[in-house]
Amino acid sequence: MEKPYNKNEGNLENEGKPEDEVEPDDEGKSDEEEKPDVEGKTECEGKREDEGEPGDEGQLEDEGSQEKQGRSEGEGKPQGEGKPASQAKPESQPRAAEKRPAEDYVPRKAKRKTDRGTDDSPKDSQEDLQERHLSSEEMMRECGDVSRAQEELRKKQKMGGFHWMQRDVQDPFAPRGQRGVRGVRGGGRGQRGLHDIPYL
């Protein structure tokens, strides 16, 4: 026997029930009871759209952080008031991007540098002084010793240059190494006479 086609036959909630047991009053309630999850989502989405951010979770997180900090755009006005959502987005994002680096990033860097400069350097210098056990007089002596050593080195270097010149002047024909070997500057024998002459 053929049953007449019923509107509710395809619905999941009516599959296990005979047609007689399905009451029209219960149908409306069961639909409402099953939909609260979906309606809750749509309500949240509706709120999000009012804020000017439809559907993007990352943008919503940014907006939530702005609300925690104290609304930056207008404290009493909702963001989407009188403007379409597409116009509200570009204004909120650049402002947030401009303000955050100015507030957070730069001062932290400056604070860190000043803290390092003031705190660490005196501690380090005090520790060094304690390790060395040096007084101001000893420090002056060390500085004097260092300057003397540098002067002596300069004198030795200058004298070394003069000694080399004196050797050439004294013994112009003294042998200075392997000149006949190939690979030495001058190609070996080609410039032998030029090296031996003290002044050209």
From Swiss-Prot:
GO terms for cellular component: nucleus. Residues 1-200 are annotated as: Disordered. The modification Phosphoserine is found at residues 30, 65. It is found in: Nucleus. Residues 37-50, 65-80, 96-107, 115-154 have a biased composition (Basic and acidic residues). Its main location: nucleus. Keywords: Nucleus, Phosphoprotein, Transcription, Transcription regulation. The keyword Isomerase does not apply. Residues 20-36, 51-64 have a biased composition (Acidic residues). InterPro entries: TF_A-like/BEX. Belongs to the TFS-II family. TFA subfamily. May be involved in transcriptional regulation. This is Transcription elongation factor A protein-like 3. It comes from Homo sapiens (Human).
